[in-house]
């Protein structure tokens, strides 16, 4: 496996909510948008017991996928790792470390002012 580079970032999401991830890729040397035309892509989510590959799209310099609500349910953290392939070799790895904030329970007490 030939890896040109690994990019890593951290995000926080709320438990049991669907999140759409869009990553715009730029050249580290020039800062210009990097064109991934002709590359293939694969994203693996790991949130406790929820571990699976998700549909990922790559258009020019934009990588997009969805973290489904059930992935973060009951999890404290997770990892989303996207591998970008060129000619069958791993060219780039985009790793997102995801902290999961527990969902707040709704107020079920009746409003005393009603």
List each language-model region with its residue ranges.
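Compositionally biased low-complexity segments at domain edges in trafficked proteins
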Residues: 108-114
